[in-house]
């Protein structure tokens, strides 16, 4: 590393400390959703393999959660694997599933995070299902950030699953269709989402410069603020995170008004 690179790093750290020093913790989002995009493009730019890109992205997660802890964020939802990702070639999907399983086990073993799976478990390999179940059980009483790991997740599928869950629940209780129709409202459907009684995301961050949600938490993000960052996920820095928080704090949330 040359002198110019060292100087640049020092300036970035100084700037990050300055931004953090001006943050009002009362204005920090309580729930942040993250679309971690750009692993493959980062790998291509770095001359690395796709698997190495996914590994670099996985390695960024604990660092990111550490930043969230430092700024008093309470809930983080990480989109690790969408339902559409299962259409990728097996030579990419296989290693990716292994990397994601490793992330789940690492988060559980860390002891700082409470892990909760959001997604359709039935489409996941049995080994992944077991890892998620074990992670939820072993971290259930952890007093730390609630980390939703969105694996095998699709926004439309979540809503379909919520409606199915609501219908099955009504059937088990002997509720008639007319009575259920009278009872259905947004709160009832919300209780059957993967996130249940959790607060909706205040802020959604998407890396890599793409400006779309791709179906991420369609129901819960109705009033969320969005922050699109040009940086690929493996290269996402603390200063990028702090800029997102600063941008969020400067906005006036209208909640549809």
Swiss-Prot record:
One GO process term, biological-process aspect: polyprenol biosynthetic process
Residues involved in substrate binding: 38-42, 54, 82-84, 86, 88, 206, 212-214
Top EC category: transferase
Protein's UniProt keywords contain GTP-binding: no
Record's GO cellular component terms: plasma membrane
Cofactor: Mg(2+)
Transmembrane segments: none
E.C. code: 2.5.1.-
Example GO molecular function: magnesium ion binding
Superkingdom, natural source: Bacteria
Active site: 37, 85
Keywords for this protein: Magnesium, Metal-binding, Transferase
Function as written in the Swiss-Prot or TrEMBL entry: Catalyzes the condensation of isopentenyl diphosphate (IPP) with allylic pyrophosphates generating different type of terpenoids.
Name listed for the protein in its UniProt record: Isoprenyl transferase 1
Binding locations of Mg(2+): 37, 225
HAMAP family: ISPT
Family the UniProt entry places it in: Belongs to the UPP synthase family.
Residues of the signal peptide: none
Species the sequence originates in: Streptomyces avermitilis (strain ATCC 31267 / DSM 46492 / JCM 5070 / NBRC 14893 / NCIMB 12804 / NRRL 8165 / MA-4680)
CDD domains to which the protein is assigned, alphabetical: Cis_IPPS (cd00475)
Classification via InterPro entries: UPP_synth-like (IPR001441), UPP_synth-like_CS (IPR018520), UPP_synth-like_sf (IPR036424)
Textual note on the cofactor: Binds 2 magnesium ions per subunit.
Keyword Cytoplasm: no
Subunit description: Homodimer.
Disulfide pattern: none
């Amino acid at each position: 590393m040359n002198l110019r690179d060292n100087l640049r790093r020092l300036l970035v750290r100084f700037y990050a400390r300055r931004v953090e020093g001006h943050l009002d913790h009362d204005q920090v989002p309580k729930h942040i959703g993250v679309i971690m995009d750009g692993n493959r493009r980062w790998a291509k730019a770095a001359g690395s393999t796709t698997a190495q890109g996914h590994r670099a992205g996985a390695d960024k997660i604990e660092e990111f959660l550490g930043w969230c802890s430092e700024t008093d964020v309470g809930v983080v939802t990480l989109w690790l694997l969408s339902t559409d990702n299962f259409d990728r070639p097996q030579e990419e999907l296989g290693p990716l599933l292994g990397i994601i399983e490793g992330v789940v086990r690492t988060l559980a073993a860390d002891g700082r995070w409470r892990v909760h799976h959001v997604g359709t478990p039935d489409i996941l390999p049995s080994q992944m299902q077991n890892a998620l179940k074990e992670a939820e059980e072993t971290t259930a009483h952890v007093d730390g950030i609630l980390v939703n790991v969105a694996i095998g997740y699709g926004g439309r599928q979540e809503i379909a699953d919520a409606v199915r869950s609501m219908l099955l629940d009504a059937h088990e209780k002997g509720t008639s269709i007319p009575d259920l129709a009278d009872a259905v409202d947004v709160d009832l459907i919300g209780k059957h989402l993967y996130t249940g009684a959790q607060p909706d995301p205040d802020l959604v961050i998407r890396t890599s410069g793409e400006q779309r949600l791709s179906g991420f938490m369609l129901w819960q993000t109705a009033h969320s603020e969005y922050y699109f960052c040009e940086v690929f996920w493996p290269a996402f820095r603390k200063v990028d995170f702090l800029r997102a928080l600063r941008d969020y704090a400067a906005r006036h949330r209208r909640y549809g008004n």
